[in-house]
């Protein structure tokens, strides 16, 4: 028997990125650059690996930059459609708007993925599990990484969502799971979403849970939050694994030293400058003999000659 797949996926990428400021004043959070493509690339690749041949991405904040980031990711045989939001609709409202525009098709369940995480999940069997059960929504779940940092999902014996707790120490007998921002949504649940701004926990999960039709499925893989500048830097450093990565459009003096850092597009690094465990991208200019350590510099930022920057976040729109 051939495993079933999700033909259509939607990636949520329209938020303002308030916690990512000041970086999100230059680029939307899902468009932030990383060595293997923008943050949203992992969501796009996951949707493709799950069988999607049509991916809808909603965009609003700095929409043109988000569109450029999506276009960077090469996905053979996949149609990518942008759903522009003049008014920010929220996570549930964005789904409803894409539905009303006919972008999500008219049949089958839809795979919905948050666009602001760095994730690599094994969704083999996830569609089969979702479609075989009488669930309006099925959450992909991971064993919890840090219950005191992120919300906890608790399942009952039938793999229905019993509780969703805020971050905190679990009860001794509780088995907490982490929601990494991936779910399957049945067509009738999509049709029930109000055509108005709203958020998924209230507008989608709430009604499904009230009917005991909000399920969870534990999957294998990894997830890292990219919610704040500190998160972003840590995820980039993990991807680098001790190496330096320099974009082809960057200009780096032969006398500069790049150590375990990401030098992104249009950056200019002068002679004898040292960049260590940092991100420098989107047109940053680093002067002669300057040092940048454990920092993120984005946009029209200019580092003076011999300036020493440690643990800073600087971002200036071009």
Enumerate the predicted regions with their spans.
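N-terminal glycine-rich phosphate-binding loop and ensuing alpha1 helix
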Residues: 1-67
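Residues at the starts of beta-strands that form the adenosine-phosphate
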Residues: 8, 53-55, 79, 136-137, ...
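A structural signal for short hydrophobic beta-strand segments in well-ordered beta-sheet cores
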Residues: 31, 153-155, 216
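Short internal beta-strands
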Residues: 56-60, 140-141, 296
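Conserved beta-loop-beta/alpha segment of the NTase-like Rossmann-fold superfamily
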Residues: 66-157
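Catalytic-core segments of class I nucleotidyltransferases/pyrophosphorylases
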Residues: 109-111, 118, 124-131, 142-147, ...
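A structural motif detector for beta-strand N-caps
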Residues: 244, 249-256, 261-262, 267-273, ...
